[in-house]
A protein has these predicted regions:
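Conserved anion-binding
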Residues: 85-89, 95-173, 178
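Conserved, mostly hydrophobic/aromatic
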Residues: 28, 46, 90, 145, ...
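Alpha-helix-loop-beta-strand connector modules within alpha/beta enzyme cores
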Residues: 56-76, 114-123, 163-179, 220-227
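Structural motif
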Residues: 38, 69, 93, 118, ...
Length: 258
C-alpha cells in the first residue's frame, strides 16, 4: 500500500505538503480535516530525536493516529541519528515515505536499501552545507531527494539560495527522482524552487499562520502555476538576493518549536 501512496504523490506533483510541526496538536483531528478540505494531497511529518538535531518532536503514536483518520500519504522526515532503528516501527505505524539524513549515517546506499526493503518509498535528505556527492551512492535506490533550504533542527533561519543550485543540478542529472524542498517555503520562494526543479514543497507557517488554509493553498498554487508558465506571481522576478534577505520566510524548519 505504501508504494501505491508514493505513486499518488508522484501523480500530484507539483504538490504542497503541509508540515504538521506547526499544527495545533490539541486539535489534531480538526487540523487534519481542515488541511484535507483545503486541498492537501499528502502530509509531511518532521520526526526529531533531540540528538541529531536539538529539538524533540513526535513519534510513532502520531503517525499511527493520522493513519487511522486519513488516507493521505504520510511523508515522514527522520531527523534522527539512527534512522534504521525507527524505520520499521514507522512503517508499522503507517508511514508511506521515509526520508533519512545523509549526515546521520555512514553508508547512505546501505540505509536506503534497507528502508526500501520495508516496502515504502525512500528518500535521502541533505543540509545546505552538505555536498551532493554525499548522497550520490544512494541515488540509484531512492525515490526522493529532500533538499533542505535551512539547516535541519535550528530556528530563526532564512531561506538559503544554495538549495536552488542543488535542485537545478539534481534535476539535470536525475530527471526521474522526486525532488522535495523544506525550509522557508512561502509565496515568494515556492516559485524559484519550482523553476529550479522541485516537485514537492514542504510548507509550515505560510499555511498554519494564515486564518484560512484554503486561501493559503490557493496562493501557493498560483505561485506554482506562475513558475510553470516561466513567470512570477507579481510580474517581476524574485532574485536569490531577495530570498537570502529573508523575504516571506513561510518556513517549516526555521520555525521549529524550541
Amino acid at each position: 500500500m505504501s508504494r501505491a501512496k508514493l505513486e499518488a504523490i508522484r501523480a500530484a506533483k507539483p504538490a504542497v505538503l503541509p508540515s504538521l510541526l506547526l499544527c495545533d496538536f490539541g486539535d489534531l483531528k480538526g487540523e487534519l480535516e481542515r488541511l484535507t478540505a483545503a486541498g492537501a494531497e499528502a502530509l509531511h511529518l518532521d520526526v526529531m530525536d533531540g540528538n541529531f538535531v536539538p529539538n524533540l518532536t513526535y513519534g510513532m503514536p502520531i503517525v499511527e493516529g493520522l493513519r487511522r483518520h486519513s488516507g493521505l500519504p504520510l511523508d515522514v522526515h527522520l531527523m534522527i541519528q539512527d534512522p534504521l532503528s525507527y524505520a520499521g516501527p514507522m512503517v508499522d505505524a503507517g508511514a508511506d515515505l521515509l526520508t533519512f539524513h545523509a549526515e546521520a549515517v555512514d553508508d547512505v546506499a546501505e540505509v536506503a536499501g534497507k528502508i526500501r526493503d520495508l516496502g515504502v518509498g525512500v528518500g535521502v535528505a541533505l543540509n545546505p552545507d552538505t555536498p551532493l556527492s554525499a548522497i550520490e551512492p544512494a541515488l540509484p535506490s531512492v525515490d526522493l531527494v529532500l533538499v533542505m533550504s535551512v539547516d535541519a533542527g535550528f530556528g530563526g533561519q532564512s531561506f538559503n539560495p544554495v538549495a536552488l543550485e542543488k535542485l537545478a543540478q539534481l534535476r539535470s542529472r536525475f530527471p526521474k527522482v522526486l525532488l522535495e524542498i523544506d525550509g522557508g517555503i512561502g509565496d515568494q520562494t515556492i516559485g524559484p524552487a519550482r523553476q529550479a526543479g522541485a516537485d514537492l514543497f514542504v510548507v509550515g507557517s505560510a499555511i498554519f499562520r494564515k486564518p484560512d488554509y484554503g486561501e493559503a493553498f490557493t496562493s501557493l498554487g498560483r505561485a506554482l502555476e506562475a513558475a510553470d508558465r516561466g513567470a512570477t506571481d507579481q510580474g517581476g522576478e524574485v532574485t536569490t538576493g531577495q530570498i537570502a534577505s529573508g523575504a516571506d520566510p513561510g518556513s517549516t524548519s526555521e520555525d521549529q518549536r524550541q
